[in-house]
Amino acid sequence: MKKKYINIENLSVSEILYDFVNKDAIPGTNINIQNFWYKFSKVVHELSPKNEALLKFRQKLQIDIDKWHLDNKDKEFNQSEYENFLKKIGYLIQEGPEFKIKTKNIDNEISNIPGPQLVVPITNSRYALNAANARWGSLYDALYGTDVIPETEGAERTNKYNPARGEKVIEYARNFLDKNVPLLNGSWKDISEIPKVFNGKLSLDLKEKKQFVGYLYKETNLYSLLFKKNNLHIDINFNLKSSIGKKDKAGINDIILESAITTIMDHEDSVAGVDAEDKVVGYKNWLGLMKGNLQIEMEKDGRKFTRKLNPDRFYTKAEQKGEVDYSELIMHGRSLMLNRNVGHLMTNPAILLRDGSEIPEGIMDAFITTLSCIHDFKTKKNSRTSSVYIVKPKMHGPDEATFTNLLFSKVEEVLELKKNTIKCGIMDEERRTSVNLKECIRNLQDRVFFINTGFLDRTGDEIHTSMQAGP
């Protein structure tokens, strides 16, 4: 079936994408719809030829490298000659002087908190919600449901709750507390009643008092004690009315760990976004995450429920250095969400340029995913610093990093954002980036927030680049 396009500002935009941008993404951003399409088209037509030139240079380099290997097949490999050749064709760049990264307004999840990072397909709303909500997770559930606890001595996983396995979970968890939140004297195994908090001070003596950072009472009962280690938090839940807590001599119902600190919501390798319909599914889910209203109806074991983004977690601050502070301590309830756009190679028929060619998909991704982030700037439920985190994959060398920086600058101009609002995660997964990594970082020094390696892509490019080096 022939797809319907809307003609606007020298672009042919798929109707489903056009409606999404105009009716869903732009309202609430103070951006004028007509101005957006005018400026967007101008940038697309300006940058598309530059994008294409970079891809042609990739091809030229590969042809040159293949030819060099074929021409030198019968000679003993000479490392020095090979390196000089790579420099001559512009593959290896002269390394410049030392410099410092200048990225500003980075969230704590990036700069100060060590922890796991998830990657999920943005086209699957359930996976996206689960990942965003994985900031906090039950240690009891994780232990009970995995082979961390051996299925021996009657501790097998069964269809129904196995008390023997549950005891092993509790034993493991108490050892975890002794290791990570040690008491001054004794063990968490010896605690026989729910602790108390008086004027912000914990009734238990810790080896490191500063580890106790917050608490929560529900009515007159202590519900949570919040501890910190290495900037990660441990929340001990108490509940004498729950099936677990009422059998626990200390009333501990669960131990909640701060877990997935960041999540990459992926528009690239984990999805197949080949047309406007596919892209809009991903864009809509990302917009819902940025607005905070993404939710799905689910059914499990005959029970219907709504899955949505978890709220922030609220505590009362603990006493620190002799000062009592009854103010509120707010912990982020969700993983910091990053967005992986596609690389420079892909094009997509969702938008056609004035010559009928497909739009470079990375340009489209940069504009529309950033546009959706503007909604988060009002609530700051994702980025507290009003930053946009875009992970950019499959860049080949410093010139492509420069192009990414230019693209992000153009997006900021069109969307009227402060300079360097968009931060860049560099995926070091191409050989030309690895050997010129310092210069790639230099060209994104005001935006870079991480370096990451996709080892499968990196291995693949190593093989592809040197394919003709073999016998």
What are these regions (language model features)?
Residues 2-76, 81-93:
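N-terminal-proximal low-complexity accessory segments that begin disordered
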Residues 2-9, 362, 382, 389, ...:
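Catalytic or ion-translocation cores adjacent to nucleophile or general acid/base/metal-coordination motifs
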Residues 2-3, 81-84, 88-403, 409-418, ...:
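Catalytic alpha/beta active-site cores
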Residues 16-19, 38-45, 62-64, 149-153, ...:
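Short acidic (Asp/Glu) and glycine-rich catalytic loops that position anionic groups and cofactors
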Residues 22, 37, 41-44, 62, ...:
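Short, well-ordered alpha-helical packing segments
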Residues 27-28, 340, 397, 453, ...:
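Generic structural "secondary-structure junction" signal
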